[in-house]
Amino acid sequence: MEEKAELVCSYFKNNKSFLIGRNGSTELEVLSYYIKNGPNTQFPQFLMNRLETYSGIFPATQESVQRWVLRYVDSLKECDAIAEGWYEPLKMEEKALLDSVIPKRDSLFLRNLEPYYFDESIRWSKYLDKKNVGIINSFANTCEEQTYLAKAIWGDKSESLLPSTTHWIPIKTYFPPKISMGSKETSWPSPINSWEQTIDYVLKSFYEDPFEVAIIGCGALGMIIGAELKKLNVQVILMGGATQILFGVKGKRWETHNIISTFFNDAWVYPMNKPVNAKLIENACYW
């Protein structure tokens, strides 16, 4: 585990762009179904609904999901390293997919994406020092605000987790219609009505206020956004749902976690702007 943490650090020490990724469980379910049933497969509606609800891909139609699969697999090719094998039910299917798409990759453990699990000397986050860093997440604004409380959140670990010289650039992402139910604070801005347009929205934000490093946690959009940013010379790491933890933003999912729950103190906050149907996402696990 520590050796792989050093490997992640080595990517950040180098000035080259890279993509360090991870596959979410819902993404793996859809990809496995596609591989098993062939390119002309019709996805079951329940699976397409899951991809929208849990991972933000909309609309939940055959055409939309087919396009997402092709773009996602294409984006995987940009991965230099990936946290894999953590989702036990589809571990073998994931390995077969990655072996065919990116045979030459650095394989990581899921925890290698989360620097607070490691000693200061092997935390990749310390290399964010003096960099412009984009936070691409639904709670990006809260995350950025929390950086001003870094010392209160992380104590003497703060400089190696949220360096005080980092310039943070929040790019707020939103929720699919099934979750946001038209709420202005949590819906993608009009006229966005498909997952492809959400990618364009995020990239437009990057062009307006560029950064050198991106920390991403935005469901099944993340790998595609990450691949596009890597092509634009950005160093990218997909932390997934754990993104908020780095910034002292807690959620139900971690309240009983044997390690992460011990980090919580009065400086930690819950996310603002809960979408109408947040409970559909694992009983509002991020709030």
Predicted feature descriptions by range:
Residues 66-74, 198-210:
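Short, well-structured alpha-helical segments in soluble
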Residues 225-287:
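C-terminal functional extensions of proteins
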Residues 138, 173, 241:
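Cofactor-binding loop segments of dinucleotide-utilizing enzymes, especially the Rossmann-like FAD-
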Residues 82-83, 213-216:
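Short glycine-rich phosphate-binding loop at a beta-alpha junction
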Residues 103-109, 166-201:
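Glycine-rich phosphate-binding "P-loop"
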